[in-house]
Amino acid sequence: MSAAAGLIPPPVSWAQRNDLIYVIIDVECKDIEHKVTEKTFTFKGVNVLDPSKKYEVTLNFLHEVDPEKVTSKNIGRCLEFTIPKKAAGPYWSSLTTDKTKLHFLKANFAKWRDESDDEEGDQKDNSMFGNFLNSPGGDWNNKFDDFNVDDEEEDSDDNIPSLSQNDEDDEEGGEGDKEKKPAA
């Protein structure tokens, strides 16, 4: 990472897939300049809310990327760069070649996907749930007709145990039997 004097690095987050890297500049900027080479990502911009804050950052990628296929989206409060890896393969252990932790760089767990999730692929087959009720054993309308519920029969709560102390007092002739007189 390098930055010129007077310039500060913007907050940057990143995530990866088997075949690409996401780099997100987590600040709303104007006068944006960016350049991606096979080994580096360079960003310059000015904070929209505070024009005295000028940002610049250069990231040295751990492995090579394909700069010709980079896409970017301005999402209002952040800029998202989708950067294809030169060669799809195992996940990178780090985004950069830097041996020290960069204070402005963090993982974006909202976009992050585990390596095992990538192996399953993006197209998970959830189609079986769409036809759940039409499947064998899924005729639920007829299942409820089998219940023998007699609406005319009264429920009996004679065998239900008491839950409060007052109910026990009522049964034993305790205070619950005393008639309360209204206040005059």
UniProtKB/Swiss-Prot annotation:
PROSITE patterns: CS
Keyword Isomerase: yes
EC number assigned by the record: 5.3.99.3
Acidic residues: bias regions: 147-158
Gene disruption: observed consequences: Delayed border cell migration during oogenesis but no defect in border cell cluster cohesion or subcellular localization of integrins. Conditional RNAi-mediated knockdown in oocyte somatic cells has no effect on border cell migration. Conditional RNAi-mediated knockdown in oocyte germline cells delays border cell migration.
Compositionally biased spans, kind Basic and acidic residues: 175-184
Keywords: Cytoplasm, Isomerase, Phosphoprotein
Broad class of enzyme this protein falls into: isomerase
Residues of the CS domain: 7-96
Positions of post-translational Phosphoserine modification: 116, 127, 135, 156, 162
One GO MF term attached to the UniProt entry: Hsp90 protein binding
Region spans: Disordered: 115-184
Gene Ontology BP terms: chaperone-mediated protein complex assembly; protein folding; RISC complex assembly
InterPro entries attached to this UniProt entry: CS_dom, HSP20-like_chaperone, p23-like
PANTHER family found in the cross-reference section: CO-CHAPERONE PROTEIN DAF-41 (PTHR22932:SF1), TELOMERASE-BINDING PROTEIN P23 HSP90 CO-CHAPERONE (PTHR22932)
Official protein name in the record: Cytosolic Prostaglandin E synthase
Source organism of the structure: Drosophila melanogaster
Protein encoded by which gene: cPges
